[in-house]
Amino acid sequence: MSIEVKMPALSPTMTEGTLAKWLVKEGDAVKAGDILAEIETDKAIMEFETVDAGIIAKILVPEGSENIAVGQVIAVMAEAGEDVSQVAASASSQISEPSEKADVAQKETADSETISIDASLDKAISNAGYGNKTENMTASYQEKAGRIKASPLAKRLAKKNHVDLKQVNGSGPHGRIIKADIEAFIAEANQASSNPSVSTPEASGKITHDTPHNSIKLSNMRRVIARRLTESKQNIPHIYLTVDVQMDALLKLRSELNESLAVQNIKISVNDMLIKAQALALKATPNVNVAFDGDQMLQFSQADISVAVSVEGGLITPILKQADTKSLSALSVEMKELIARAREGRLQPQEYQGGTSSISNMGMFGIKQFNAVINPPQASILAIGSGERRPWVIDDAITIATVATITGSFDHRVIDGADAAAFMSAFKHLVEKPLGILAQ
């Protein structure tokens, strides 16, 4: 009996992905544990292993295909003793026949069984003057063989929000409607409802601009970054606290540590020490090591620090788990491994999903100070500015010191200003008296 190879769920939250590359071809024999393909999620490219043995009879989804729903059949394998060509032919016919039936069914029921538009949504679109645009969208789809192409996730979201798929312009392959299209349509309608007399072309993702330009399609990662940061700024009331921290003692200790660790080929970075200081400060102020969760607050018993790492096409935050318990040398080695895998796109979901707080360091770019956006569902993030030589008062005397400006962003729903201040004070003390970092 033939074996269906389905799009895997490579993380608990994955609903769709991109089939980045096939590592096998039709006719190849495979065994359990062999890698079939590379799947791109919103944060990484991951290898997909088969759990069955057989021969690849037919590849149904070509590499490079985007927005492939979890559970969709992407290939068919023939078991030992089966006629490979017969399995391939059967797979091909099964693809075309349901498609033809769906076309006929769609044509017969298009007028009588379309998803109704919620009255308020319809009114919002009408008030904002989107009537002509909607008619054009509907006409364009009616001209296309009478069938609307949409992903299963998009269909569920449309049904839940009473959106007529005929009014949505698909941005997926061959005009296929994907989840992002439904979300954009709903956002546009909501914007129209709140500003009925104002034309907002930006809401639809179509900006009119006379300046010569290139249109660059957003990657999966960039779309997720855009969505999550928008959610953060819209839903989380940020409070910002800033401190100036003298770095000289920490820099001196780092130099001494690296001299002694050189024989082990370990080099501790300033960021490694700041991560450890952040973790210890979180343990010292448990009211900050928390997360907002609807009608409850989660208080964490360990400090898992998400570290912002710049990668091609965006940003990812690998996690140093239990950073408060790790030695500086162990923390440094693990961090370098995580950064390397992050830039190769080889992180596993459990290595970047979660965390109790984040840190973002832009000091190496000469940035003096910035406010970082909280990474939900976390409730805090540290923004590290560059260390620079500044006048500094010590014992009523002015001297020159290396000083960095560091800003903490906190979720004011669960973190009070006084608790945030206590955390920043604890962090500052650990950096300026860095032996405390080694002692814990």
UniProtKB/Swiss-Prot annotation:
Record InterPro entries: 2-oxoA_DH_lipoyl-BS, 2-oxoacid_DH_actylTfrase, Biotin_lipoyl, CAT-like_dom_sf, E2/Pdx1, E3-bd_dom_sf, LAT1, PSBD
EC code(s) of this entry: 2.3.1.12
Reactions accelerated catalytically: N(6)-[(R)-dihydrolipoyl]-L-lysyl-[protein] + acetyl-CoA = N(6)-[(R)-S(8)-acetyldihydrolipoyl]-L-lysyl-[protein] + CoA
UniProt cross-references to PROSITE patterns, sorted A to Z: BIOTINYL_LIPOYL, LIPOYL, PSBD
Occurrences of domain Peripheral subunit-binding (PSBD) (ranges): 149-186
Cofactor details (free text): Binds 1 lipoyl cofactor covalently.
GO cellular component terms, semicolon-separated: pyruvate dehydrogenase complex
Positions of the catalytic residues: 412
Keyword entries, A-Z: Acyltransferase, Lipoyl, Transferase
Requisite cofactors: (R)-lipoate
GO BP annotations listed: pyruvate decarboxylation to acetyl-CoA
Keyword Transferase appears in the UniProt entry: yes
Residue numbers spanned by region Disordered: 91-113, 192-214
Source organism superkingdom: Bacteria
Keyword Transferase carried by entry: yes
EC top class, as a word: transferase
One term of GO molecular function: dihydrolipoyllysine-residue acetyltransferase activity
Pfam families documented for this protein: 2-oxoacid_dh, Biotin_lipoyl, E3_binding
Subunit structure comment from the entry: Forms a 24-polypeptide structural core with octahedral symmetry.
PANTHER family on file: DIHYDROLIPOAMIDE ACETYL/SUCCINYL-TRANSFERASE-RELATED (PTHR23151), DIHYDROLIPOYLLYSINE-RESIDUE ACETYLTRANSFERASE COMPONENT OF PYRUVATE DEHYDROGENASE COMPLEX, MITOCHONDRIAL-RELATED (PTHR23151:SF90)
Family affiliation: Belongs to the 2-oxoacid dehydrogenase family.
Function: The pyruvate dehydrogenase complex catalyzes the overall conversion of pyruvate to acetyl-CoA and CO(2). It contains multiple copies of three enzymatic components: pyruvate dehydrogenase (E1), dihydrolipoamide acetyltransferase (E2) and lipoamide dehydrogenase (E3).
Protein name: Dihydrolipoyllysine-residue acetyltransferase component of pyruvate dehydrogenase complex
Taxonomic source organism: Zymomonas mobilis subsp. mobilis (strain ATCC 31821 / ZM4 / CP4)
Gene: pdhC
